[in-house]
Amino acid sequence: MSAAREVAIGIDLGTTYSCVGVFQHGRVEILANDQGNRTTPSYVAFTDTERLVGDAAKSQAALNPQNTVFDAKRLIGRKFADPTVQSDLKHWPFQVVSEGGKPKVRVSYRGEDKAFYPEEISSMVLSKMKETAEAYLGQPVRHAVITVPAYFNDSQRQATKDAGAIAGLNVLRIINEPTAAAIAYGLDRRGAGERNVLIFDLGGGTFDVSVLTIDAGVFEVKATAGDTHLGGEDFDNRLVNHFMEEFRRKHRKDLSRNKRALRRLRTACERAKRTLSSSTQATLEIDSLFEGVDFYTSITRARFEELCSDLFRSTLEPVEKALRDAKLDKAQIHDIVLVGGSTRIPKIQKLLQDFFNGRELNKSINPDEAVAYGAAVQAAVLMGDKCEKVQDLLLLDVAPLSLGLETAGGVMTTLIQRNATIPTKQTQTFTTYSDNQPGVLIQVYEGERAMTRDNNLLGRFELSGIPPAPRGVPQIEVTFDIDANGILSVTATDRSTGRANKITITNDKGRLSKEEVERMVREADEYKVEDEAQRDRVAAKNSLEAYVFHVKGSLHEESLRDKIPEEDRCKVQDKCQEVLTWLEHNQLAEKEEYEHQKRELEQICRPIFSRLYGAPGIPGGSSCGAQARQGAPSTGPVIEEVD
């Protein structure tokens, strides 16, 4: 039989929620996780016994706030000193420390202090999405397309790619979220002719606007703009601050230092925010929020809009910028497409609609799933899927920021302009600044400012061995090359000697080295083994518990009550009680110990129930072992048959 054809998945790695899709049999399937949810919280929790990812991690966040990590996307690819990281630290219950200028999350796991890079936390979420896909497909998954905000810079893209590698994925492509959403929107509108589409993507932590032209399966991005630090969580923060102040006013108590109270308040605020998208008022009821005080309050939609008014208004600036860069008037936009959960907020819809002079907004695609949908389509294209629907699909994306190098006086000389279609390659010739200069330092920057000090340094390298010559004579050719992932390589060549040097902006400071990624891959495998051992342990404990209660229940069944001699009944009851007491005191025992306890109980039960039925095995509850041979009565505990 031929092996199953390899498929690639599309993953929307979100700030607050993630989503995975696969393109099969001509259509995209968005996959539900083990809880039946089509989106999975981007949360990882560490306890004394196990590591939890997704729904399980988020649901215990209030009980374990300092070891429940979220928002890794707001840390990934950033420096610890980054002002946005410093402002976020105030809102996070978990500890973030600096190691060599890079942020690391410090938690307690199995009684030990551990520190993880944001890439490692994100890789755990990606592993969860990978497992979700594998459970659905029934085969291992190795290849994926992962999405990032269009405005993510080079280091954030590379760090996301590293996270994929740590999760054991071959990342086929990093694509921009609004572009992926545009694929989801445009795939079924092939015959509509050329259309200019504006994608307005406001998620849990990031905001993007992209202007595209879609025509006969060609998706050409004209311009992109955004804010990698604006989203639903910022609206939650405004609500949390508002209610914290109200609590202080009403009860003269400051709950800002109590992590558990803050987590419960944040969860209630998130729920209230969602309610306000469909109702004009939301109520918060939190029992014993802080120092035994119950907190009952309400908020109107108008008050919420006032609290966030500056944030809501700020979403229009990138819209104007993207239209300006695309050289399009707002009247030339055919479709305005909403993506991301935060676009459900009525005020944001109204602001956008008013900006476009009352035009209808397009809400035809699922805002939570559109990005994963588009990523799954792109994954199928890259794997060479022959389906007619994706056969001619062509994606032309752009570089979100200008790229250049520093020339005399700290001036930014741009080689690749922002919104240049990628992949792209640009070459320019430079020369020396002083006589007999033996080498040049190539410093690579991204950003839009005239001086390099105001832009972001990506990396630097030296080209040495230039023959002595007066200033202005040597010719140094510098080439900037961006691949389809938006990741940059820079080469410098001395024309007279042919001597060259190059840098791929991947192992620059703030990046993980190849060795670090490999170490993290090994550690991820170890965590997986630990997780499986924990699952086996829990299964063995549950099996023992179920068996004990099944035996106890059987003793009280009417049909058996009179058939079991009193001495045997007492013997079984005493043993059951002994096992239950042992269970109470050994919640963290090893799998083998649970199995040993079960075997001991079985040894006492087996002869008693065998005499009763005249058979070595007795059918009963499905959780307690193998079915006995046919013809035996269908009551009593299940005893596993031994060959």
Curated annotation (Swiss-Prot):
The record ties this protein, via InterPro entries, to: ATPase_NBD, Heat_shock_70_CS, HSP70_C_sf, HSP70_peptide-bd_sf, Hsp_70_fam
Where do the segments described as Nucleotide-binding domain (NBD) lie?
A: 3-388
Binding sites annotated in the UniProt record for ATP:
14-17, 73, 204-206, 270-277, 341-344
User: Pfam families, from UniProt?
Assistant: HSP70
Superkingdom of this protein's organism:
Eukaryota
Q: Does the keyword Nucleotide-binding apply?
A: yes
Under Gene Ontology molecular function, one entry of this record is: ATP hydrolysis activity
Q: Does the keyword ATP-binding apply?
A: yes
Transmembrane domains' residue ranges: none
What are the BP-aspect GO terms? chaperone cofactor-dependent protein refolding; protein refolding
- An annotated GO cellular component: plasma membrane
Cite the residue spans of the region called Substrate-binding domain (SBD): 396-511
Q: What induces it?
A: By heat shock.
Task: Could you list this entry's UniProt keywords, alphabetically sorted.
Answer: ATP-binding, Methylation, Nucleotide-binding, Stress response
Region of interest (Disordered), residue spans = 620-643
Q: Which family does it belong to?
A: Belongs to the heat shock protein 70 family.
Q: Briefly state the protein's biological role.
A: Molecular chaperone implicated in a wide variety of cellular processes, including protection of the proteome from stress, folding and transport of newly synthesized polypeptides, activation of proteolysis of misfolded proteins and the formation and dissociation of protein complexes. Plays a pivotal role in the protein quality control system, ensuring the correct folding of proteins, the re-folding of misfolded proteins and controlling the targeting of proteins for subsequent degradation. This is achieved through cycles of ATP binding, ATP hydrolysis and ADP release, mediated by co-chaperones.
Q: Which PANTHER family match?
A: HEAT SHOCK PROTEIN 70KDA
This protein's domain notes: The N-terminal nucleotide binding domain (NBD) (also known as the ATPase domain) is responsible for binding and hydrolyzing ATP. The C-terminal substrate-binding domain (SBD) (also known as peptide-binding domain) binds to the client/substrate proteins. The two domains are allosterically coupled so that, when ATP is bound to the NBD, the SBD binds relatively weakly to clients. When ADP is bound in the NBD, a conformational change enhances the affinity of the SBD for client proteins.
Name of the protein in question: Heat shock 70 kDa protein 6
Tell me the organism's taxonomic lineage: Eukaryota, Metazoa, Chordata, Craniata, Vertebrata
